[in-house]
């Protein structure tokens, strides 16, 4: 995964998420929406073949946090949830 910044302003961040597709992009978008300071979070796949693994994101915030901070918090939340699932799974398979 690689992030290519397209545009960065005080309350706006646009970037490509290189190497990912709808699976992670949708999870990230939904997790960003859980943050009360995120006013807009969405992605698009600009071309279904040529850009299939390069979603373009746009994140806007209310100014209380930066879009970069919102992205960082969403990534951490996804990581924590995945860790919780792994711990539950490990508990199940050890029984």
From Swiss-Prot:
UniProt family annotation: Belongs to the archaeal Rpo11/eukaryotic RPB11/RPC19 RNA polymerase subunit family.
Catalyzed chemical reaction(s): RNA(n) + a ribonucleoside 5'-triphosphate = RNA(n+1) + diphosphate
Segments traversing the membrane: none
Subunit relationships: Part of the RNA polymerase complex.
Cysteines engaged in disulfide bonds, as pairs: none
Database matches in HAMAP family: RNApol_arch_Rpo11
Gene: rpo11
Domain of life: Archaea
Database matches in PROSITE patterns: RNA_POL_L_13KD
EC id: 2.7.7.6
GO terms under cellular component: cytoplasm; DNA-directed RNA polymerase complex
Keywords: Cytoplasm, DNA-directed RNA polymerase, Nucleotidyltransferase, Transcription, Transferase
PANTHER family: DNA-DIRECTED RNA POLYMERASE I,II,III (PTHR13946), DNA-DIRECTED RNA POLYMERASES I AND III SUBUNIT RPAC2 (PTHR13946:SF28)
Protein name: DNA-directed RNA polymerase subunit Rpo11
Cellular compartment(s): Cytoplasm
GO molecular function annotations of the record: DNA binding; DNA-directed RNA polymerase activity; protein dimerization activity
Job description of the protein: DNA-dependent RNA polymerase (RNAP) catalyzes the transcription of DNA into RNA using the four ribonucleoside triphosphates as substrates.
Any one GO biological process: DNA-templated transcription
CDD domains from the UniProt entry: RNAP_L (cd06927)
Any Pfam family the entry gives: RNA_pol_L_2
């Amino acid at each position: 995964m690689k992030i290519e910044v397209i545009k960065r302003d005080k309350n706006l961040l646009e970037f490509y998420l290189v190497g990912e597709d709808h699976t992670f992009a949708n999870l990230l978008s939904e997790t960003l929406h859980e943050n009360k300071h995120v006013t807009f979070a969405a992605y698009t796949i600009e071309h279904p073949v040529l850009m299939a693994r390069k979603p373009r994101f746009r994140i806007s915030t209310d100014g209380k946090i930066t879009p970069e901070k919102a992205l960082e918090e969403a990534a951490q939340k996804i990581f924590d949830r995945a860790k919780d699932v792994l711990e539950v799974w490990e508990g199940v398979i050890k029984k």
